[in-house]
């Protein structure tokens, strides 16, 4: 990919993010990559068939229009599924063009095939499990300050034995893209199944959905439910993609049945339970009742450790591959987005070094990873963070902000918090109202306008609001 194409792709992603909103973009488009640009067509890729089908069905026009705003000559978007190194590599599929409002119901049926790559036996054919990557084990996971708790909790789950008391259930791990959630979940599955004492099943939310739909169509829903409830440890990845009221209801019943029976459930998503707005309130409540752990962004020390680990792994197949420490330090300092970019950087250096028979140098690294060095993204601020910081600033409790109390010492902090939620997050007025004790959107709008008017006249309040913004953005 040329630098010009990379710049165009960055602008298209920016338009798409603005058009659909931050939450929709994070859920459906964050893992979309640009593969190539031709005269009248653009080739994009996504990691799963489910994402491909969903984007084609629901967002084809928007993706195409965003590209046409950048390149009017583009009339076609080809969307394919990236193949990844798995225990059993999936068959390559032909690129399918995105066409406006194209309905593709074959994708669901195609994905109902049994995947035998996850090492678990089940009594229902839809529970073969999702593919596991043999590289994603505890031994290859690099531990740092941002993921210590998540790693420790996952390790404890993996080392448990059948009949042991469950300390936290479910274990819910959330983070942004590429920070290690899937690595930990697959490590739990590999380790849990190694002793053959417990049945540990790894499923993506996509696989769960398709398995349930297949069971309904084949009239084997009861067998599907019984097979799921016979699992000792159920591991669900990318829960934010769970769609459909019927499927969510079945997931909720399964979750309750497993937890009530003392079986372990481990879940990962890209946001905390309270932010999974598409999920039923009962599901969010049950998820929040377990151990919720956030994996924060990777610090520079952890990034350096990941890079060293990837070099060591590469040397298992390429013994002469060497990356000088100054190069690793440069990469750790410059590539700050996620672990996948770090791995991609090592893969590029390996390919360039081997194909050109050249040693890795700092100049080579600067040239090869230029497009991976992104501007520092602003911190994503959550409504819970705003409520916590405002409550601390005004010496009230978070429950006061959510309550119906109308005393002056509570009303003003609540209005300030609503104002900050509107100005610092992408949440809608109705959603902000719901997060402040179920208030109407007109209440939020009144609070926003009230504080907007006051900060222009009240210097003290203006200073307080700016101080709160700085605290939240640090």
Curated annotation (Swiss-Prot):
Residues 1-73 are annotated as: Domain I, interacts with DnaA modulators. Keywords: ATP-binding, Cytoplasm, DNA replication, DNA-binding, Lipid-binding, Nucleotide-binding. Coiled coil: none annotated. Pfam families: Bac_DnaA, Bac_DnaA_C, DnaA_N. Residues 73-130 are annotated as: Domain II. The keyword DNA-binding applies. One of its GO terms (molecular function) is ATP binding. Its main location: cytoplasm. GO terms for cellular component: cytoplasm; plasma membrane. Gene3D superfamilies: 1.10.1750.10, 1.10.8.60, 3.30.300.180, P-loop containing nucleotide triphosphate hydrolases (3.40.50.300). It is found in: Cytoplasm. ATP binds at residues 178, 180-182. Plays an essential role in the initiation and regulation of chromosomal replication. ATP-DnaA binds to the origin of replication (oriC) to initiate formation of the DNA replication initiation complex once per cell cycle. Binds the DnaA box (a 9 base pair repeat at the origin) and separates the double-stranded (ds)DNA. Forms a right-handed helical filament on oriC DNA; dsDNA binds to the exterior of the filament while single-stranded (ss)DNA is stabiized in the filament's interior. Oligomerizes as a right-handed, spiral filament on DNA at oriC. This is Chromosomal replication initiator protein DnaA.
């Amino acid at each position: 990919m040329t630098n010009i194409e990379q710049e165009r792709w960055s602008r298209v992603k920016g338009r798409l993010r603005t058009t659909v909103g931050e939450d929709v973009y994070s859920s459906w488009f964050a893992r979309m990559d640009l593969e190539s640009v031709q005269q009248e067509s653009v080739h994009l890729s996504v990691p799963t068939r489910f994402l491909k089908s969903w984007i084609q069905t629901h967002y084809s026009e928007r993706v195409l229009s965003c590209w046409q705003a950048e390149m009017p000559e583009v009339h076609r978007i080809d969307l394919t599924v990236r193949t990844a190194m798995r225990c059993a590599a999936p068959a390559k599929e032909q690129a399918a063009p995105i066409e406006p409002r194209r309905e593709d119901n074959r994708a669901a049926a195609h994905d109902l095939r049994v995947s035998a790559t996850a090492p678990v036996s089940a009594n229902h054919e839809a529970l073969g499990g999702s593919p596991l990557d043999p590289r994603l084990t505890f031994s290859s996971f690099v531990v740092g300050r941002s993921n210590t708790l998540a790693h420790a909790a996952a390790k404890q789950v993996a080392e448990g034995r059948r009949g042991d008391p469950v300390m936290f259930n479910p274990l819910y791990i959330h983070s942004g893209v590429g920070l290690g959630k899937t690595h930990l979940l697959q490590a739990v599955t590999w380790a849990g199944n190694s002793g053959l004492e417990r049945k540990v099943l790894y499923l993506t939310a996509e696989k769960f959905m398709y398995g349930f739909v297949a069971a309904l169509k084949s009239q084997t829903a009861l067998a599907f439910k019984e097979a799921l409830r016979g699992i000792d440890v159920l591991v669900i990845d990318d829960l934010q993609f769970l769609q459909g009221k019927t499927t969510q209801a079945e997931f909720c019943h399964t979750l309750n049945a497993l937890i009530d029976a003392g079986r372990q459930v481990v879940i990962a998503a890209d946001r905390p339970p309270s932010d999974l707005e598409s999920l039923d309130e009962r599901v969010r409540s049950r998820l929040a009742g377990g151990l919720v752990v956030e994996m924060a962004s990777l610090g520079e020390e952890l990034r350096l450790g990941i890079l060293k680990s990837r070099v060591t792994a590469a040397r298992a197949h390429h013994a002469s591959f060497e990356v000088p420490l100054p190069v690793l330090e440069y990469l750790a300092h410059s590539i700050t987005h996620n672990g996948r970019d770090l791995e991609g950087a090592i893969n590029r250096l390996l390919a360039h070094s081997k194909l050109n028979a050249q040693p890795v140098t700092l100049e080579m690294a600067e040239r090869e990873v230029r497009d991976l060095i992104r501007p520092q993204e602003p911190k994503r601020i959550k409504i819970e963070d705003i409520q916590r910081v405002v409550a601390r600033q005004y010496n009230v409790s978070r429950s006061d902000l959510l309550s119906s109390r109308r005393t002056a010492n509570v009303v003003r902090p609540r209005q300030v918090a609503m104002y900050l939620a509107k100005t610092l997050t992408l949440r809608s007025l109705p959603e902000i109202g719901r997060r402040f004790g179920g208030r109407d959107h007109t209440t939020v709008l009144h609070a926003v306008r009230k504080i907007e008017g006051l900060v222009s006249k009240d210097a003290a309040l203006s200073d307080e609001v700016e101080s709160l913004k700085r605290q939240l953005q640090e």
